Swiss-Prot record:
Family note: Belongs to the FliT family.
Quaternary structure, from the entry: Homodimer. Interacts with FliD and FlhC.
Protein known as: Flagellar protein FliT
HAMAP family according to UniProt: FliT
Disulfide bonds: none
Gene3D superfamilies: Flagellar protein flit (1.20.58.380)
Known function: Dual-function protein that regulates the transcription of class 2 flagellar operons and that also acts as an export chaperone for the filament-capping protein FliD. As a transcriptional regulator, acts as an anti-FlhDC factor; it directly binds FlhC, thus inhibiting the binding of the FlhC/FlhD complex to class 2 promoters, resulting in decreased expression of class 2 flagellar operons. As a chaperone, effects FliD transition to the membrane by preventing its premature polymerization, and by directing it to the export apparatus.
Keyword Acetylation belongs to the record: no
Region described as Required for homodimerization: spans on this chain: 1-50
Keywords from the UniProt entry: Bacterial flagellum biogenesis, Chaperone, Cytoplasm, Repressor, Transcription, Transcription regulation
Example of a GO biological process term: protein folding
Protein location: Cytoplasm, Cytosol
Length: 121
């Protein structure tokens, strides 16, 4: 069975999904990025299934190589953007933790505001 056209089309779809994920990450549309991940994983599984059935010819591999490079480049860029986002979230969680500690330490003052006063002697 010649599945070369179907395999090539599957790779094109994977490239499109990869480019979509990169665009979403670049635009910081994190919810949409996560939602698109399953379609990407399914596309990868489809390609794996197709290549298990019949190994692509050397010619087909040469045609697919630029697509694979693009997909890997996009994936690397998405990972970098995700790492930046994770660092931002870690910083926010750290700030929130500090605020919680401050509120815990100073929030139980019985409703009194503690402030320095001038000595009136």
């Amino acid at each position: 069975m010649n599945n070369a056209p179907h395999l090539y089309f599957a790779w094109q779809q994977l490239v499109e999904k990869s480019q979509l994920m990169l665009r979403l990450a670049t635009e910081e549309q994190w919810d949409e990025l996560i939602a698109s991940e399953m379609a990407y994983v399914n596309a990868v599984q489809e390609i794996a299934h197709l290549t298990e059935e019949v190994a692509p010819s050397t010619t087909m591999q040469e045609q697919l190589r630029p697509m694979l490079r693009l997909i890997l480049d996009n994936e690397s860029k998405v990972k970098q953007l995700l790492q930046i986002r994770m660092d931002e979230l870690a910083k926010l969680v750290g700030q929130s933790s500090v605020q919680k500690s401050v509120l815990s330490a100073y929030g139980d003052q019985g409703g009194f505001v503690l402030a320095p006063q001038d000595n009136l002697f």
